[in-house]
Structure formats: C-alpha cells, structure tokens
C-alpha cells in the first residue's frame, strides 16, 4: 500500500513539473491582434484619423526588402477608409500606418507598452516581462534598436505593423491592449 502512495506522489510531482502557464511562459507572434496596438500608436500620434484612406492592391514595396509585403487578400482591398482597413485586417494599410508612425516612434511606443526594456546597448536584442509575480514568465523577443530603426531597411517596421517577426506572451498583449 505504501508503494501505491509513493507512486501516486511521484506521478503528481511529475505532472506538476509539466504544467506551464502558457499565458506567461510561452511567446507567440501576435499577428493581426497587434494591429490594435499599431492603430493606437497612430491615433495617438495624429498620423491617422477617421478620415484617413488607404489603397491596397494586394502588396506593397518596402525599403530594404527584396519581395513585397503581401496582404492576406491577394487581389487587394482597393480604396478603403481607416475603419474598413481595420475591418478588413489589411496588411498593406497597416504597413502604410506603420510608415506614418516611423521606426523610431514605433520603437518608443513598443517600449512604452512594456514589450521590452532598453539596455543602453543599441545593438542588443531585447526582451521584456510584465513583472507578474509568478514563476516561469518568459520575455518577449524584439529586434535590437540598431536593426529596427535602420532607415535603409524598413522591413522590420513593416512586419511589426501587422504583428509579425517578433514574439510576445499573451499576457503582454492583453496588458498592452488594456492600455490602449
């Protein structure tokens, strides 16, 4: 009988070790859910308003990128208002919005939203956490400032504008959206 109790205890301990709180321990590319953050940055900076319009032909060229950034709708959305660009989740419109914000301001906002903390080394890849008092919290994965803010290569800004090529935890995304 004592063997059964020990075995049950070992199984319980092993299961506990396997448990992870994925909201804080795993990072993901946020994709289109990040467009809320980009939109908040743009509205705050006054680079877009409810009268802004965008044209989506299905793709757009970006300085420093050999292939165009494509919208999920290959034929494009055509002319659209800001509201329609959000409703359509249009990547091309959000690349344009990101370019209006600019790489330096976008980077500053990303830091202000808590996705990373600058270290003083502009060539360092950055991470950030929410500071939640739970074990196992992972940090985000962001570009170095030198790479992101390179005016001759805006591909990172373009991709970040619609939530690609960086990783954050679900809790970081929820925290940032709550601040919008």
Q: How would you label these PLM feature ranges?
A:
Residues 1-32, 37-180:
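Beta-lactam-recognizing serine transpeptidase/beta-lactamase-like catalytic domain environment
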């Amino acid at each position: 009988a004592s063997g059964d109790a020990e075995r049950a205890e070992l199984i319980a301990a092993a299961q506990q070790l396997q448990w992870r709180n994925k909201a804080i321990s795993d990072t993901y590319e946020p994709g289109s859910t990040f467009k809320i953050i980009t939109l908040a940055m743009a509205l705050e900076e006054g680079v877009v308003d409810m009268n802004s319009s965008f044209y989506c032909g299905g793709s757009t060229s970006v300085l420093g990128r050999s292939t165009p950034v494509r919208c999920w709708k290959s034929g494009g959305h055509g002319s659209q208002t800001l509201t329609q660009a959000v409703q359509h989740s249009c990547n091309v419109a959000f690349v344009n919005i990101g370019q209006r914000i600019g790489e330096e301001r976008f980077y500053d906002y990303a830091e202000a939203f808590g996705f990373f903390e600058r270290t003083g080394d502009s060539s360092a890849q950055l991470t950030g956490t929410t500071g939640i008092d739970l074990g196992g919290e992972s940090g985000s994965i962001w570009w170095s400032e030198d790479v992101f803010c390179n005016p001759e290569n805006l591909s990172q800004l373009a991709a970040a504008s619609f939530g690609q090529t960086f990783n954050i935890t679900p809790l970081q995304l929820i925290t940032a959206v709550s601040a919008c």
